[in-house]
Amino acid sequence: MKKPASEPKKCGATTGDLGEGAHRAWGALLRSHAHFVERIERKLSAQGALSPEAYDVLLMLSYAPNHRLRMGELYETATLSRSGLTRLVDRLEKEGWVKREVCPNDRRSFEAVLTASGEAARARSWPLYAQAIAREFGHFFDEKEAHTLADLLERPLGKGESEAQV
């Protein structure tokens, strides 16, 4: 008599051990991220477009109510360290794309506020950014594979955390 099939064991779910699949996936994720970001940044830089980090900050502000976020809230959505985000916001402020304002509810905090010229810079960069993503990343996957990959990568983030689109 055949044993009933058991559920597949999740990597490290009970023992803390890292399975071969999880180890391989983690390494591939890190290498792929570095590979694609470097190639896309190079293309964008050659075309005089915003960096992916600058674009993402401007995008998060464009989605925010009244186009403003506290610096702490912006940090939670950014892919930079706190000091890296502060330096980036400094640069965006010098360009006139973002301004800092004292938070009306907490005078100890600052909000980053998207300016009209910041939104225009983001909008100008999007076609170049989309083209670079398509050329450097998108052509590796058909539409179904891209959705599957997105679903898998979004799973650890939990529902709602991945809703902001590039």
Model-based region annotation:
Residues 38-81, 165:
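N-terminal helix-turn-helix DNA-binding core of bacterial DNA-binding proteins
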Residues 2-4, 8-12, 90-148:
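Charged, amphipathic alpha-helical coiled-coil/dimerization segments
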Residues 1-48:
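N-terminal leader segment of winged-helix/HTH proteins
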Residues 36, 40, 78, 121-140, ...:
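Alpha-helical linker/hinge and terminal dimerization helices associated
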Residues 1-20, 143-166:
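C-terminal regulatory/oligomerization modules of transcriptional regulators
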